[in-house]
Curated annotation (Swiss-Prot):
Subunit description: Part of the 50S ribosomal subunit.
Protein name, entry field: Large ribosomal subunit protein uL30
Species: Leuconostoc mesenteroides subsp. mesenteroides (strain ATCC 8293 / DSM 20343 / BCRC 11652 / CCM 1803 / JCM 6124 / NCDO 523 / NBRC 100496 / NCIMB 8023 / NCTC 12954 / NRRL B-1118 / 37Y)
Single GO molecular function: structural constituent of ribosome
InterPro entries: Ribo_uL30_ferredoxin-like_sf, Ribosomal_uL30_bac-type, Ribosomal_uL30_ferredoxin-like
Keyword line: Ribonucleoprotein, Ribosomal protein
GO biological process, one term: translation
Keyword DNA repair: no
Short name of any one Pfam family annotated for the protein: Ribosomal_L30
Family: Belongs to the universal ribosomal protein uL30 family.
GO cellular component: large ribosomal subunit
Highest taxon of the lineage: Bacteria
Length: 60
């Protein structure tokens, strides 16, 4: 299973507190910051809630 590269493309400022918490829990800080996370249900669930703020790519 491939990992996921998650890039924050929109700011979390002025978003719901739950969405800000998810962005922080994924390890994303500033706009254009990226992290590589395992492709599992927990990560997919977090991405579902902030899909409008991030860009997701599969990496090997």
């Amino acid at each position: 299973m491939a990992d996921l590269k998650i890039t924050l493309i929109k700011s979390a400022v002025h978003r719901l507190p739950k969405q800000r918490a998810i962005v922080k829990s994924l390890g994303l800080g500033r706009v254009s910051s990226s992290v590589v996370k395992p492709n599992n249900e927990a990560t997919r669930g977090a991405i579902f809630h902030i899909a409008h703020l991030v860009n997701v790519e599969e990496v090997k």
